[in-house]
């Protein structure tokens, strides 16, 4: 349901009071989230949703894994993949969408969801 409020022509009153779990709440008061939301609004004129925060996190998670894995321009694609897999299955990552995120060998991420409610046509942290 995250993103439903931005569907063109959607009557947001239909979702009023809807509760959902999401990895990201744009109105969370921590400094990291507020800095991201502010920069996103300035760049795109809209409030970011879960998918924007996920994209932001994945760039920095890959960067962290690449640095820790010693990835460089002399490596071939197979070596890069092996290094990334090794790092992702052994590291933790603190991002906008979760603290202490981990990944298993299949690539599935483990992170705690946040509860939000749709109130007055916007997502609100619970």
Regions found by a protein language model. Give the residues of each.
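Extracytosolic ligand-binding ectodomains
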Residues: 1-126
């Amino acid at each position: 349901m995250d993103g439903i409020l931005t569907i063109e022509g959607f009557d947001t009153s239909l979702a009023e009071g809807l509760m959902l779990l999401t990895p990201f709440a744009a109105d969370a008061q921590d400094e990291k989230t507020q800095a991201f939301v502010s920069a996103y609004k300035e760049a795109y004129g809209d409030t970011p949703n879960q998918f924007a925060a996920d994209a932001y996190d994945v760039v920095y998670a890959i960067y962290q894994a690449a640095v820790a894995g010693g990835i460089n321009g002399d490596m071939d694609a197979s070596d890069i993949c092996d290094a990334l897999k090794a790092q992702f299955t052994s590291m933790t990552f603190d991002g906008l969408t979760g603290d202490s995120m981990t990944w298993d060998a299949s690539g599935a991420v483990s992170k705690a969801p946040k509860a939000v409610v749709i109130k007055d046509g916007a997502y609100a942290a619970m």
